[in-house]
Each structure stands twice: as C-alpha cells, then as structure tokens.
Amino acid sequence: MNYLKLTFDKLDVGALNDQVAHESCGAVSLFVGTTRDNFEGKTVVLLEYEAYEAMAIKTMNLLCEEVRARWPDVVNIGIHHRLGTVPVKEASVVIAISSPHRKSSLEAVHFTIDELKKSVPVWKKELYDGEGSSEWKENSECTWSKKYKDNHIL
C-alpha cells in the first residue's frame, strides 16, 4: 500500500510509522527531513513550500512503482510532504518504508529521498533573519536545475 500526502498540517512521524508497519515486516525505515536554522552563513527562520499538487502526487506514485520494481519485498511506502510554512526543527518531509528485512527498507528510503528531490514538483523558499530576505532554493539533484545540467551530460 502507498500512503502519500501533501499537507499544510504538521507532519506526524509516529502516525506514518504506524501506518506502514505490517505484521510480515521486521523493518520500518524512516527519513525525516527537517528545517535547519542556517544555510551558507545565513540564519534561516523558516521554509515555505509550494507544489504542483496533482503532478506531485502522480510523480510520487510513479516513484513508489519504481521502488517496488527495485525492491520487490517492500510492503508499504509512506511519503508525506509539508506545504506552506515550516519552522526550524519541524519536519518538511517524512518517508517510511516497511519490508521483511532492514536492507531493502534502508536502501529504498535512501533511493526515495534522492528521487523525490530529483523529480517531484515541490519548491522550497528559505526565509532569512534580519532584513527579511528570502531565496527560492534549487535542488542540485533536480534534472531541470542549472547545477544538474552543469554536472551531467544531457
């Protein structure tokens, strides 16, 4: 089963862990991405996320299909992404994957966060302390980013 959600509400890590847990599984692996208070010497106050929601959910479903093709023993996949304002220390993304043994779930979680950042249309703006400046961030993994194009043959 896939448990996918984009929400403006605070993410509940424990609830997603419980959702993906399964009696046939000895492992639930989690990734929790949180807002940190700094970036390149600037003090970060909060993040703001926007998404092309219909396309994001569609892409997340395709990502789940790819995970299941690579790790056939994966049972449940949960991907919850926050939208709107996310203060420092709060979760912006939670990925939880269950499998009978830890190797598959650990590898699948690592793959999922990397692919999520590459392909799912969610955008992040950092707001900085001081003069109220902000900056839209570009993931270097994202295939349409300049950083990606500079480092890959297209």
Curated annotation (Swiss-Prot):
Pathway info: Cofactor biosynthesis; molybdopterin biosynthesis
Q: Which InterPro entries match?
A: MoaE_sf, MOCS2B_euk, Mopterin_biosynth_MoaE
Pfam families for this protein:
MoaE
Recorded catalytic reaction(s): these are: 2 [molybdopterin-synthase sulfur-carrier protein]-C-terminal-Gly-aminoethanethioate + cyclic pyranopterin phosphate + H2O = molybdopterin + 2 [molybdopterin-synthase sulfur-carrier protein]-C-terminal Gly-Gly + 2 H(+)
Q: Which GO terms describe its molecular function?
A: molybdopterin synthase activity
Q: Which GO terms describe its cellular component?
A: cytosol; molybdopterin synthase complex
**Keywords tagged on the record:** Cytoplasm, Molybdenum cofactor biosynthesis, Transferase
Q: Which GO terms describe its biological process?
A: Mo-molybdopterin cofactor biosynthetic process
The residues the record assigns to binding substrate are 101-102, 117, 124-126
Which PANTHER family does this one have?
MOLYBDOPTERIN SYNTHASE RELATED
The record makes one more remark, namely: This protein is produced by a bicistronic gene which also produces the large subunit (MOCS2A).
Q: Subunit notes for this chain?
A: Heterotetramer; composed of 2 small (MOCS2A) and 2 large (MOCS2B) subunits.
UniProt-recorded name of the protein? Molybdopterin synthase catalytic subunit
